[in-house]
Swiss-Prot record:
Pfam families: RsfS (PF02410). It comes from Aspergillus niger (strain ATCC MYA-4892 / CBS 513.88 / FGSC A1513). One of its GO terms (biological process) is mitochondrial gene expression. This is ATPase synthesis protein 25, mitochondrial. Belongs to the ATP25 family. The lineage of its organism: Eukaryota, Fungi, Dikarya, Ascomycota, Pezizomycotina.
Length: 686
C-alpha cells in the first residue's frame, strides 16, 4: 500500500542507519508516518546544538522537535494572501491619483466637475488635459466659448467604448444631444473587427501578406461635442458695429477629444491650441499697449446653418481687408442697416437745399421740425423721395442725359451740390443709389455695366452696402431694358449678360453671409425668367413661349423644393408674379400657405386677390373667387371689413362673374352673388 513511500525511505542510506538507542519499530513509524509540521518563519536550516543532558533524544528527531516548538512560540498564525487586509495608503499616495484630474478654469460650467470625474474614474481616460478656449474665435465646427478636454484611451476598443459611454451618459444624465465624430456604433465595430480578423486568417492560410492599411475602423481619434452645456446668465448688450450672419453664441460648450496614445503624439493637439492661446494673449497685450483704456472685445459667432442639431471654416482666421470676390473690407453684423446713409457734412447745405427745392411746384420737401441728426439725412433722402414720386417719364427727364451730366436739371444740380461736401464713402453709396433708380426707370443713359461697376467700387473700397441696397441692385440688373439702348438688346427682355451680373452680386451677398434663398430673390428671378429670351428653344414664337414656360416651371419647382421661409410682403409680390404669368396652381398653393405658417391674411391680401381676378377677365375664375373668399373674409381671425378699394374690386369681380347681377339684385334674387352685391351696395350707402 505504501510501497512507493517505503521504497523511497529505504533507498536513503541515512534511513538504514538507525541509532542504537532507537528501536527498529520507531524508525519504521517515523518513515511511514512523518511528523506533520506547520509552516514556520524560521529557516529549516537553522537548528540549535543539543545540550549534553539531551543525549537520550535521538539525533534524527531532535531538530524537527525544536523547529516545531520555535514556530509555535515565536511566530503568529499564517494568514493567506487573499485574506490579508491591505495597509491604509498614506495621504500623499491617495491624492496622487487625483492630481491627474486637471484643475477647473475660472467660472466653470456646473457640469464640468462631474464630467471630469466621470471621464477619469468611470471611463478611465489617462493624461487628462483641460484647455480653456473661451477667449478665442474657435472654429465653427466646434462652436464658440469652448472648453476642451483631451484624454488618452488604452486601445482602439477602449476608445470606441469610452466615446459611446460618454455620449449615453450625457444624454441620460443631462438631457444633452452630443455627437461624436469618428465613432462607430457597437454592432458596426464588432462586424468590422470580425471581418478584419477573417481576412487576416484567410491571408495566413494562403501564405500572402495581410495588408494592414486604413480599413475605416478607426482613426485613433474621436471628438465628442456635448454642445451648449450652460447658457450665459448675463445677457450682453448687442453691438451693431459689425456685420455678418448667424446669431451670437451665448452659452459654454464642452468638447472631449479622445485619442489613442500613438494618435495623440502624432496630432499634438495641446501644442496647437497652446500656440493659438499664446498668439491671442500677445495680441491682447499689443492692443492694450496701443490703447490702454479700450476694453478687449471678443467676437464669437456660430454657423449654421440652421444650424445643425449641434453646431457645425475653420480655425482662428484673421480678417482680411478684402472679400474673396470683390476685395471688400468687411466687418460682422447681426442687423440690417437702412438704405439711407448718413451724410454728415451734407448738413451744412441742408437749409439752402430746402429753400431751392421749396421753390419748385413739385414741393420736394415738407416743412417739419427736424432735429440736427435728421437734417444730416433729409437733404439726400428728400431728393430720392422726390424722384420715387415721379412717373417713369418724368424721372428719366430729371436724371438728365447720363452719369456725366451734373447740371442739366435742378435735381442733378442739388444732388452734386450735396456730394461736394460728402465723404468718399457717402459719394460712392449715393452714386450707387442713383444708378439703381435710373436703371429701374429704364433710363437709356445709365447702363447696367455702369451699375455693376458702381457696386464693385463700393465693395472693393470696403464701404458698407446694406442688404436692402444690394437687393435693389439685383432687382435693377434684372429689370427689362428699353429697345434701342444697344444693338443686341430686345425690348422688354433681360439679356443673359444682365443675368450674369445679377448672379455675381448674389454670389457676393452669399459669400458675406446674407441669406439669398428667400422669396424676394426668387420673385426677381421668376420675373426675369418670364421676360427673358429662351436660349434653348428653337426658332419660332410658339417654341420660345414653350421654352419660357419650361423655365418658369423649373423655378416654381425649385421654390417648392426649398420650402422657403414665409414672409408676407415677399409672398404677396411672388403671388402677384405667379398670377400675372398664368401659374394659378402655384398662386393658390402660396395663398393657402400663409395661415399654415402663422401669417394672417390682411385687407391688402384680399385687395390683391380680387383685383387680379377682376383684371384677368375670366368669368369662371371670378365666380369661384367671390363665391369662396367673400365668406372667408368674415371668418378670418381678424375679420376683413368691406370698405374702400377692396369694396370696389369686389364689385368688379361680381359684375364679371355675372354681367346681369344688377338686374337680378333689383328683382330680388336670392342667389349668393345677388346677396353679395346687396351687401356691397349697403356698405357703399353708409
Amino acid at each position: 500500500m505504501n510501497r512507493a513511500l517505503l521504497r523511497a525511505a529505504w533507498s536513503s542510506g541515512t534511513a538504514l542507519r538507525a541509532p542504537p538507542s532507537v528501536s527498529r519499530a520507531a524508525v519504521y513509524r517515523s518513515a511511514i508516518h512523518p511528523v506533520n509540521r506547520s509552516f514556520a518563519s524560521v529557516s529549516c536550516l537553522q537548528s540549535e546544538q543539543p545540550s549534553s543532558s539531551s543525549s537520550a533524544v535521538p539525533p534524527a528527531l531532535e531538530p524537527k522537535d525544536e523547529l516545531t516548538g520555535n514556530s509555535t512560540s515565536e511566530s503568529t498564525p499564517h494568514i493567506p494572501w487573499y485574506l490579508q487586509e491591505e495597509a491604509p495608503l498614506a495621504e500623499s499616495e491617495q491624492t496622487f491619483s487625483r492630481d491627474q484630474i486637471p484643475e477647473l478654469p475660472t467660472n466653470p460650467p456646473a457640469i464640468l466637475p462631474a464630467l471630469l470625474d466621470y471621464v477619469f474614474k468611470d471611463i478611465g481616460l489617462d493624461a487628462l488635459k483641460l484647455i480653456d478656449l473661451r477667449g478665442l474665435e474657435t472654429p465653427p465646427a466646434l462652436g464658440a466659448n469652448v472648453i476642451m478636454i483631451i484624454g488618452t484611451a488604452r486601445s482602439v476598443k477602449h476608445l470606441n467604448v469610452s466615446a459611446d459611454r460618454l455620449c449615453r451618459w450625457l444624454r441620460s444624465t443631462y438631457k444633452l444631444s452630443p455627437y461624436a465624430d469618428g465613432l462607430l456604433g457597437r454592432n458596426e465595430l464588432k462586424i468590422k473587427l470580425r471581418r478584419k480578423a477573417r481576412r487576416a486568417r484567410l491571408a495566413s492560410r494562403s501564405g500572402t501578406m495581410f495588408d494592414e492599411k486604413d480599413d475605416g475602423i478607426t482613426t485613433g481619434w474621436i471628438c465628442v461635442n456635448a454642445g451648449v452645456v450652460e447658457e450665459t446668465p448675463v445677457k450682453k448688450d448687442e453691438s451693431y458695429s459689425f456685420e455678418g450672419f448667424g446669431h451670437t453664441a451665448t452659452g459654454t460648450r464642452v468638447v472631449v477629444q479622445i485619442f489613442t496614445e500613438e494618435k495623440r503624439a502624432e496630432v499634438d493637439l495641446e501644442s496647437l491650441w497652446q500656440k493659438a492661446l499664446d498668439r491671442s494673449e500677445r495680441e491682447k497685450q499689443r492692443l492694450s499697449q496701443v490703447n490702454p483704456g479700450a476694453p478687449s472685445e471678443e467676437v464669437r459667432a456660430s454657423n449654421s446653418i440652421n444650424v445643425s442639431p449641434s453646431d457645425r471654416e475653420f480655425g482662428h482666421a484673421s480678417r482680411f481687408p478684402t472679400s474673396p470676390l470683390f476685395g471688400q473690407k468687411r466687418l460682422l453684423h447681426t442687423d440690417h442697416r437702412p438704405i439711407s446713409q448718413k451724410f454728415d457734412r451734407a448738413a451744412i447745405h441742408a437749409e439752402d437745399t430746402e429753400e431751392a427745392l421749396g421753390s419748385q411746384s413739385s414741393s420736394l420737401l415738407r416743412d417739419h421740425d427736424h432735429s440736427d441728426n435728421e437734417k444730416k439725412l433729409r437733404s439726400m433722402d428728400a431728393l430720392f423721395d422726390h424722384l420715387s414720386n415721379l412717373s417713369d417719364v418724368q424721372a428719366r427727364i430729371e436724371l438728365g442725359e447720363g452719369p456725366e451730366d451734373h447740371d442739366s436739371t435742378l435735381f442733378l444740380r442739388l444732388f452734386h451740390d450735396v456730394l461736394s461736401v460728402s465723404s468718399a464713402e457717402e459719394k460712392a453709396i449715393a452714386r450707387l443709389v442713383l444708378f439703381c433708380n435710373a436703371i429701374s426707370r429704364q433710363h437709356p443713359g445709365y447702363t447696367k455695366r455702369g451699375l455693376y461697376a458702381a457696386f464693385t467700387e463700393c465693395t472693393c473700397a470696403g464701404y458698407l452696402v446694406s442688404d436692402d441696397l444690394a437687393f435693389s441692385v439685383v432687382s435693377a440688373l434684372l429689370s427689362p431694358r428699353l429697345a434701342g439702348t444697344s444693338s443686341e438688346d430686345v425690348a422688354g427682355q433681360v439679356p443673359e449678360a444682365d443675368q450674369e451680373l445679377a448672379l455675381l452680386v448674389l454670389e457676393h451677398l452669399s459669400l458675406r453671409g446674407t441669406n439669398v434663398v428667400n422669396m424676394r430673390v426668387f420673385d426677381m428671378i421668376y420675373r426675369a425668367v418670364a421676360i427673358s429670351p429662351s436660349t434653348t428653344a428653337p426658332d419660332g414664337a410658339n417654341d420660345a413661349q414653350t421654352g419660357n414656360k419650361s423655365s418658369l416651371y423649373r423655378v416654381t419647382r425649385l421654390i417648392d423644393t426649398l420650402d422657403l421661409p414665409f414672409e408676407p410682403e415677399q409672398a404677396r409680390s411672388l403671388m402677384l408674379s405667379l398670377f400675372q404669368h398664368g401659374d394659378y396652381d402655384d398662386f393658390w398653393k402660396l395663398w393657402r400657405k400663409g395661415p399654415l405658417n402663422g401669417s394672417l391674411r390682411t385687407a391688402a391680401d384680399y385687395k390683391m386677390l380680387f383685383r387680379l381676378h377682376a383684371d384677368l377677365g375670366d368669368e369662371l375664375r371670378a365666380r369661384d373667387c367671390v363665391s369662396t373668399w367673400i365668406p372667408m373674409m368674415r371668418r378670418e381671425d381678424n375679420p376683413i371689413p368691406l370698405e374702400g378699394e377692396l369694396l370696389v374690386d369686389i364689385k368688379r369681380c361680381l359684375m364679371l362673374a355675372d354681367p346681369d347681377i344688377v338686374q337680378k339684385a333689383a328683382e330680388g334674387s336670392t342667389s349668393n352673388l345677388a346677396r353679395f352685391w346687396n351687401a356691397c351696395q349697403m356698405k357703399m350707402l353708409r
